[in-house]
Regions:
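Catalytic Walker B motif of ABC-type/P-loop ATPase nucleotide-binding domains
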Residues: 103-106
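Conserved ABC ATPase "signature" region
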Residues: 57-74
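Conserved beta-strand-loop-alpha-helix hinge in the C-terminal portion
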Residues: 158-181
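H-loop/switch region of ABC-family ATPase nucleotide-binding domains
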Residues: 138-139
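Conserved ABC transporter NBD signature motif
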Residues: 10-24
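Conserved ABC ATPase signature
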Residues: 78-82
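A short, surface-exposed alpha-helical micro-motif characterized by mixed small hydrophobic
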Residues: 144-146
Length: 184
């Protein structure tokens, strides 16, 4: 979906327009599970400003995101001095500032404690409210229940179930997940 792997068949449509695979990166921001592959600058603040300096009131937005993701005390630190979870939240912060309409998050809560998982959930909801389409690849059911409006359950790359997130379907999702993981 983000264009990293060549698709052999099918077409991509965004806002009703056919988009060539080579142009997907113009529309999609992909946050990798391994954050080290997406960090390029010498400070947390500069990482968030990278490519976004023309955004009006960028400094104010950077401060807001640092606070939202519990990174304000690390704003001057080198990204490689951060813990894995802090790096993960930093790359999500960069996605928040991106002007791309589609965000893909790969396992955005792996290794996070409850407070930081909730901070990432707030960031996802912030992006959704800003009009971004957010795809989340995860095994974290608590996180999905806090962020998703729809869940696609996949097995071996095939959609097994497509559910609107409601209290009734939350139970079905948990049950399906437990059955699949438990091997019933």
């Amino acid at each position: 979906m983000s264009g990293l792997i060549r698709c052999r068949q099918g077409a991509f449509y965004i806002d009703g327009k056919n988009v060539k695979q080579q142009k997907l990166s113009d529309y999609v921001y992909f946050v990798m599970q391994e954050a080290d592959h997406q960090l390029y600058t010498d400070s947390v603040t500069e990482e968030l400003r990278l490519g976004n300096k023309r955004i009006p009131s960028i400094d104010e937005k950077v401060s807001q995101i640092l606070k939202m993701l519990h990174l304000e005390n690390f704003k001057d630190c080198h990204p490689y001095a951060l813990s894995g979870g802090q790096k993960q939240r930093l790359t999500i912060g960069a996605a928040m500032l991106s002007e791309k309409p589609i965000i893909v998050l790969d396992e955005p809560t792996s290794g996070l404690d409850w407070d930081n998982m909730c901070a990432v959930a707030n960031a996802v909801n912030y992006m959704r409210e800003a009009g971004k389409l957010v795809f989340i690849i995860t095994h974290d059911l608590e996180f999905i229940s806090l962020t998703a409006s729809r869940a696609l359950l996949l097995k071996e790359g095939i959609i097994k179930d497509d559910l609107q997130m409601t209290e009734q379907n939350n139970f079905k999702i948990v049950k399906n997940f437990m059955v699949e993981e438990g091997g019933e």
